[in-house]
C-alpha cells in the first residue's frame, strides 16, 4: 500500500489451503579450516602455547531448522526465502582465530601468566527495515544499494549513501561493502568485520604455611588493554545493518520510498570491559 506495507497473504499460491509443509533436504555447507598449534616449555615450569586457525565457511542457509517461516527470521534473502540455490558466506564464518598463552617461570613463589585471544573476519549483511518481498518477515531482506554516481538514482538516496561513505565514524568494512554493491542487491554476509582480541593477565603468590600446606593469593585482570584505555580491548564487530527503512510506496513508479540510516556501519563497540578477580586458595 501507500505506506509500503506488503500483504504477505497475496504471495500464496492458492487460497484453498492454509498451510502446507514440504520437507526437503537442500541445506549445504562447505567448511575448510587449517589449524596450527604448539607448546614450548622452558626453565622448569615456564610455558608458551600458540594456536592459529584459518577458516572458510559457506552455506546456502545458516538456519538449522525445518519450517520456512522460522528460517526466514535469520536467513537474509534477495526475494524468495525458499530459494536455496546460492552459496555465500555463512553466519558462522570467521577468517582468523588466534589464541596465545604464556606463563613465566615461578620465582620466589610468584607466577605470572597472560592469555591473548582474538578473532577476525566474521560476517554481516546490509538489509532493509521492512517487509520488501512480502514474506511476512521485516528483518531479512537484503538491500539494493543505489549507485550515487548513477544519474538515475534519486537525489535523496544519493545524498544518504554519500553521507554514510563520508562519515568518519562508519567502519571501513561497511564502506567497502557498500561500494562493492553499487547497482545491485548486497550479497548475503558480504560485510567483513576486522580482527579484535583481548589480553588477560594473572599474577599469583604462594605462601608456604606448614609442611605440604600452602596459601595462594591470586589476582586476575581480564581485558588489560581496556584498563589502560577505555577505547582499547573493545570490538567493532557489526551485526546486520539496516541501511534503509521503508517510508512508503510510490504507486506510479512502483517502487519503495526509503529513509536512509545515517548510522549504518557505526559500531556501538562490543565486548566485556576490564574486570578484576581476587582469589584465595588454601591447599593441604
Task: List each language-model region with its residue ranges.
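Acidic helix/loop microenvironments that form the catalytic cleft of cell-wall polysaccharide enzymes
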Residues: 118, 220-225
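Gram-negative outer-membrane beta-barrel transporters
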Residues: 1-111, 115-123
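Outer-membrane beta-barrel proteins
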Residues: 42-44, 104-112, 205-209, 215, ...
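Extracytoplasmic gating/loop element in the C-terminal half of outer-membrane beta-barrel translocons
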Residues: 111-211, 242-265
Amino acid at each position: 500500500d501507500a505506506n509500503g506495507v506488503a500483504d504477505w497473504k497475496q504471495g500464496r499460491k492458492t487460497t484453498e489451503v492454509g498451510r502446507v509443509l514440504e520437507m526437503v533436504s537442500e541445506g549445504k555447507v562447505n567448511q575448510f579450516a587449517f589449524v596450527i598449534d604448539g607448546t614450548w616449555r622452558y626453565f622448569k615450569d615456564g610455558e608458551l602455547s600458540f594456536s592459529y586457525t584459518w577458516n572458510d565457511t559457506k552455506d546456502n542457509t545458516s538456519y538449522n531448522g525445518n519450517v520456512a517461516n522460522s528460517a526466514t527470521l535469520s536467513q537474509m534473502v534477495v526475494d524468495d526465502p525458499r530459494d536455496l540455490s546460492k552459496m555465500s558466506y555463512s553466519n558462522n564464518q570467521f577468517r582468523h582465530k588466534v589464541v596465545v598463552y604464556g606463563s613465566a617461570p615461578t620465582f620466589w613463589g610468584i607466577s605470572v601468566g597472560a592469555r591473548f585471544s582474538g578473532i577476525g573476519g566474521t560476517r554481516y549483511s546490509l538489509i532493509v527495515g521492512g517487509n520488501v518481498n512480502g514474506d511476512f518477515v521485516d528483518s531479512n531482506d537484503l538491500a539494493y544499494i543505489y549507485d550515487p554516481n548513477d544519474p538515475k538514482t534519486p537525489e535523496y538516496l544519493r545524498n544518504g549513501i554519500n553521507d554514510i561513505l563520508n562519515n568518519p565514524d562508519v567502519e571501513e568494512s561497511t564502506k567497502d561493502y557498500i561500494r562493492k554493491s553499487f547497482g545491485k542487491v548486497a550479497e548475503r554476509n558480504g560485510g567483513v568485520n576486522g580482527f579484535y582480541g583481548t589480553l588477560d593477565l594473572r599474577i599469583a603468590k604462594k605462601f608456604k604455611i606448614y609442611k605440604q600446606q600452602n596459601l595462594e593469593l591470586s589476582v586476575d585482570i581480564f581485558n588489560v588493554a581496556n584498563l589502560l584505555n577505555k577505547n582499547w580491548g573493545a570490538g567493532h564487530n557489526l551485526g546486520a545493518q539496516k541501511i534503509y527503512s521503508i517510508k512508503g510506496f510510490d504507486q506510479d513508479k512502483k517502487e519503495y520510498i526509503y529513509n536512509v540510516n545515517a548510522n549504518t556501519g557505526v559500531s556501538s563497540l562490543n565486548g566485556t570491559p576490564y574486570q578484576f578477580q581476587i582469589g584465595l586458595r588454601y591447599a593441604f
